[in-house]
């Protein structure tokens, strides 16, 4: 079986919340795709409940696209501690951390239920499992801790 980088990361050494560049892959025509680890809570110490994580996912899908060029996808980790962000091209971890911070600020302090995309039976595969309240509370907690652009030391972005 192929080795997966995320499973070789020593989860006891990272200091969440942070943004980490996992890899940059280059296609046959030279196009680059980057994969980032957006770690919102400390692994094996906490996990975001599914309803809040699900709502954060739906909101980040739009908010990160508003802030970063080339966003392909933002998908939650099964462990519920953060997200993979996949983009065309390369962004610095500082740029991604600032976009994430700004997005979480919007979730925490401005977002209303009407702003959450994909919350109907037609538009979501598990539309009943959402909580804007939880998304807001977790966003505030993450923002209070500060988002670092380095995974192994705290270097909080402004």
From Swiss-Prot:
The keyword Transport does not apply. Fe cation binds at residues 54, 58, 124. Gene3D superfamilies: S-ribosylhomocysteinase (LuxS) (3.30.1360.80). It catalyses: S-(5-deoxy-D-ribos-5-yl)-L-homocysteine = (S)-4,5-dihydroxypentane-2,3-dione + L-homocysteine. GO terms for biological process: quorum sensing. Binds 1 Fe cation per subunit. Its cofactor is Fe cation. InterPro entries: LuxS_sf, Metalloenz_LuxS/M16, S-ribosylhomocysteinase. It comes from the Bacteria. Keywords: Autoinducer synthesis, Iron, Lyase, Metal-binding, Quorum sensing. Its EC number is 4.4.1.21. GO terms for molecular function: iron ion binding; S-ribosylhomocysteine lyase activity. Pfam families: LuxS. Involved in the synthesis of autoinducer 2 (AI-2) which is secreted by bacteria and is used to communicate both the cell density and the metabolic potential of the environment. The regulation of gene expression in response to changes in cell density is called quorum sensing. Catalyzes the transformation of S-ribosylhomocysteine (RHC) to homocysteine (HC) and 4,5-dihydroxy-2,3-pentadione (DPD). Belongs to the LuxS family. HAMAP family: LuxS. Homodimer. This is S-ribosylhomocysteine lyase.
């Amino acid at each position: 079986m192929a080795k997966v980088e995320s499973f070789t990361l020593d989860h006891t050494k990272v200091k969440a919340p942070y943004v980490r560049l996992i890899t940059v892959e280059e296609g046959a025509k030279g196009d680059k795709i980057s994969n980032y680890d957006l770690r919102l809570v400390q692994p094996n110490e906490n996990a975001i409940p599914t309803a809040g994580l699900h709502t954060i996912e739906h909101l980040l899908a739009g908010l990160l696209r508003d802030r970063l060029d080339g966003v392909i996808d933002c998908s939650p980790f099964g462990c519920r501690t953060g997200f993979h962000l996949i983009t065309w091209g390369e962004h610095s971890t500082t740029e991604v951390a600032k976009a994430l911070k700004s997005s979480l600020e919007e979730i925490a302090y401005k977002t209303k239920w009407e702003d959450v995309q994909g919350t109907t039976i037609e538009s979501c595969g598990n539309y009943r499992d959402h909580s804007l309240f939880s998304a807001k509370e977790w966003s505030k907690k993450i923002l209070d801790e500060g988002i670092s652009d380095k995974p192994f030391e705290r270097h909080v972005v402004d």
